[in-house]
Amino acid sequence: SQRLLYQNITSIQLFPGVESALCAIARRNVAIAVVTSNQLRNVLAVLGEELAGLVSVFECEAGFFTKARKLRSALRQAGVKPGEAVSFGDESRDIEAARKVGIPCAAVTWGYAHSEVLRHHQPDYLLTSVDQIMGIVAE
């Protein structure tokens, strides 16, 4: 249930290196948007106040068929064109949604889906380490 998920959210931690990557992206004055199927309160609980403050746009509770719409909304709110953005995701539907919107997509192998599943969907980038994020952002 949602209540149980919220109660257990304090045990969820960011993957090592994600915090420093978010800080480095923010230092470059790059807008950060979070588009997720999760609820906002859960996202804020995991990020904490400091990291949440680096995020320009939150689009939460994105369903299977609404992720592309939420991505478009996040771009509009951030004032960013699809070709100027990069989507980072850990599921095949993240790749599909980014494609629908025209955003280059980077699939990360340390999350939900197995790397072979992600590779099959042919993302623009397949990242095996958080350290690779800044190389993509710098392009």
Annotate the PLM regions:
Residues 1-5, 50-56:
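Short, basic/glycine-rich phosphate-binding loops at helix/coil junctions
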Residues 52-66:
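A short, structured active-site edge motif that brings together acidic residues
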Residues 13-17, 38-39, 62, 66, ...:
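Short beta->alpha linker loops
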